[in-house]
From Swiss-Prot:
Protein name: Cytochrome b6-f complex subunit 8, chloroplastic
GO CC aspect terms: chloroplast thylakoid membrane; cytochrome b6f complex
Organism of provenance: Volvox carteri
Stated family: Belongs to the PetN family.
Keywords assigned: Chloroplast, Electron transport, Membrane, Photosynthesis, Plastid, Thylakoid, Transit peptide, Transmembrane, Transmembrane helix, Transport
Gene encoding the protein: PETN
Phylogenetic placement of the source organism: Eukaryota, Viridiplantae, Chlorophyta, core chlorophytes, Chlorophyceae
Annotated transit peptide: 1-67
Primary residence: plastid
Alphabetized InterPro entries for the sequence: Cytochr_b6-f_cplx_su8_sf, Cytochrome_b6-f_cplx_su8
S-S pairs: none
Any one GO BP annotation for this protein: photosynthesis
Record field: transmembrane: 72-92
Taxonomic superkingdom: Eukaryota
Membrane-protein topology: Single-pass membrane protein
Length: 98
């Protein structure tokens, strides 16, 4: 009979007691509070977008550097820049009247 009493004690201990339930008062959100919450969400989203823009640009630049250009293309662009700069300097010097 001791075994039966121990089983009864264990089952009584292991059973969770039912919590008493209380009514919860629910209030509707005021329009002003809702607008303030939406403004906060919009501000957070815009801040996040501005923070991610430089990161996205940097990732694109890294991808472009990883792909690379042939040396002849880089030399061609450098020559074009030099010719343009020299031409512009000759025009400015010629129009200065010296």
């Amino acid at each position: 009979m001791q075994c039966v009493s121990r089983v009864a004690q264990r089952s009584a201990v292991s059973r969770p007691r039912v919590a008493s339930r209380q009514a919860v008062k629910v209030q509707a959100v005021k329009p002003a509070e809702q607008k303030a919450a939406m403004a906060a969400v919009a501000a957070t989203a815009s801040t996040l977008a501005l923070a991610l823009a430089p990161a996205a640009q940097a990732a694109q630049e890294v991808a472009m550097l990883a792909e690379g250009e042939p040396a002849i293309v880089q030399i061609g662009w450098a020559a074009t820049c030099v010719m343009f700069s020299f031409s512009l300097s000759l025009v400015v010097w010629g129009r200065s009247g010296l």
